[in-house]
Amino acid sequence: MEFQTADLCDANESRVKIVSPMFRSYGGRGAFCGRITTLKVFEDNSLVRTALEGPGQGKVLVVDGGGSMRCALVGDQLALLGVKNQWAGVIVYGCIRDSKAIGTMELGVFALGSHPLKSIKKGAGDVDIAVTFGGVTFTPGHFIYADEDGVVVSESSLL
C-alpha cells in the first residue's frame, strides 16, 4: 500500500495527529502503516516478544518504553518474529539494537536510537492501553502511518 505522510496530512489535516519528529528509521521497510496495538514497558522487553510472537495481521506495534536510552527493547530476533508473523512495523519510544540486521528485514522499525545492551526480562508492563509520547496519544485500534517524513495517527483509516 503506497502512501506519503505529507499527502495524508494535506488531504486529512483535521483528522490526523502528527508525532513530533524524534524517530529514526531502522527497518528495511521505509514506509509502513496499520492498526495500532500498544505496549507500555520500561527497560523490559518480555511483552514485546509476546506481542511479536502473535499474529500481526499487518498491524503496527507501538512500544512506549518511557524514552529510555539505557537498553534496547527490540533486536534482530524480535524483529525477525515480527516479519514471520506479518507485522507491518514497530515503533519504539526507546532503543533497538542489531540495527544492521534489522535494516535488511522487510519490517518497518522506528526508534529513538540504538543501544547494544539487552533489556531485562521480568514480564512487567501493560498491553493495549492508550500511551502518549511525541505529543500524540496512540490508541489501540486507531491507525498509524510512518515514512521518511514522519509519523501520523488517525482514528480511522486514511487509505
From Swiss-Prot:
Role summary: Catalyzes the aldol cleavage of 4-hydroxy-4-methyl-2-oxoglutarate (HMG) into 2 molecules of pyruvate. Also contains a secondary oxaloacetate (OAA) decarboxylase activity due to the common pyruvate enolate transition state formed following C-C bond cleavage in the retro-aldol and decarboxylation reactions.
EC number: 4.1.3.17, 4.1.1.112
Domain of life (superkingdom): Bacteria
EC primary class: lyase
Keyword terms of this UniProt record: Lyase, Metal-binding
Keyword flag Lyase: yes
Stored Pfam families: RraA-like
Cofactor(s) listed in the protein's UniProt record: a divalent metal cation
UniProt record similarity statement: Belongs to the class II aldolase/RraA-like family.
Any one GO molecular-function label of the UniProt entry: metal ion binding
Protein name: Putative 4-hydroxy-4-methyl-2-oxoglutarate aldolase
